[in-house]
Every structure is written in C-alpha cells, then in structure tokens.
Amino acid sequence: DRVNHSAEAMMITPTVSSEEMVDIIMDGIKKYNSNQAIYIRPMYWAIEGGDLAIVPKQGVTGFAICLEDIPMADPNLAATLTTTSFRRPVLEDNVVNAKAGCLYPNNARMLAEARTKGFSNALVADIMGNVAETATANIFIVKDGEVFTPIPNGTFLAGITRNRHISNLKADGYKVHEKVISFKDVSEADEVFMSGNMMKVTPVKAFNDTNYQNGPITKRTRELYWDWAKSG
C-alpha cells in the first residue's frame, strides 16, 4: 500500500491496486531462478502537468515495477557512521510522507559528506537536532538489553522492515521503545544497527570515535527476520 499512499502524497493518482501489483510481481519473478534475490521497486510518475506544468494532471499516471537481481549483502558487513551538516526535511518543505525520488539528492549529499570524512554512512538529525535515521535506512540502538528506535515525527518514513523488526523483537520477549533519541544516546549504546528493505539488518561498528560489536540482539534481529520471511 505504501506506493499508493506515496503517490497520493505527491498528488499523483494511483492506478494499480496492491493486489494487482502482487500479481504482476509474481508473474515477473518467474523469469528468475529460485536462488536469486530480487529487489522489487514499484513506481508511479506524473505524465502531464496542469498550468505551468507543476501540479500533476489527475488520472494521467505512469506506472512500472522494476525487478532487479541484487544479491543479499554479506551478513558480516558492517557500517560506520558519522554526523552530517544536512538534515531531514519536514512536511512544510518536502514530501517526507512519501517514498519519493525527489528526497534522494539530499540523502546523496549526506552520504558524500560522510565518505569524505572516512565513514560509510551518515547519522542524520531531524529539524530539532535529534536522531532521525541514517542517510539510507532507519536506525536502532540497544542499551542494557532493551531496544530503542526514533519515534516517527514526520521527518522520516517508518519503514516496512523497521516495523517488522519491532513486531518480531516484541514477540520474542524484548522491550522495544520508540522515543526521542539523541546523538549522545547513540554514542553510549551497547549495539547499533540499521534497518532497510534492501539489507534488512546492517550492524554498525562505529559512530565517530565510538566502536561497537555485532552484538547478540543485532544478530537475533537478523535471525528473527529470516525466520519470519521463510515462514511464508
């Protein structure tokens, strides 16, 4: 449903139901081998604009689904994080309530800045200066056996995989808190991991000068995810 909600947020008329998308995807993946990892990208775009070609013309919508063979990342691959001078936007100045391509240039400059500092990704602040997410994924921290993740505040998307991790961890008996998280909280965490649809779980081994291990709860989060995925 997220792609249709995103289209509506961008004033684009969604034209394909979730059920129809699933049918198209199931037909498309028949062309791949069962051992291939297929990344699925449904997308809409406006074909015509109204006056000044800015506001999308309603009902005239392009749609496609991209199926791409992208191998799963090495489970031992870990990220390093640093801060960035760029922040997550707010609804008043961008479509933060949509999964939208127009948001990615901001993410790209976050990543580029982090890499010039010798890190693989950026830990990004919201408008208030608290932790929102990384440049590419949602963020979780672990402290004293409990799990914490930034509470959605309209500056980032609470991802599908993020929500699955929360459900899995709670069902497994862990306490999971959605709350305001500071950069100091991240520095003082026992474990840190990233959550995204492409990589599922990515351990974080450093935030600036602070180092972390790929700890037991990070590993358990990965196990729970794949147990859930294979159960279907």
Question: Language-model features: where?
Answer:
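Ordered, amphipathic secondary-structure segments that act as subunit-interaction surfaces
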Residues: 18, 34-42
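Phosphate/pyrophosphate-binding loops at sites that engage ATP/ADP/AMP, CoA/4′-phosphopantetheine
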Residues: 28-33
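Helix-start/capping segments and mature chain N-termini
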Residues: 1-27, 45, 51-232
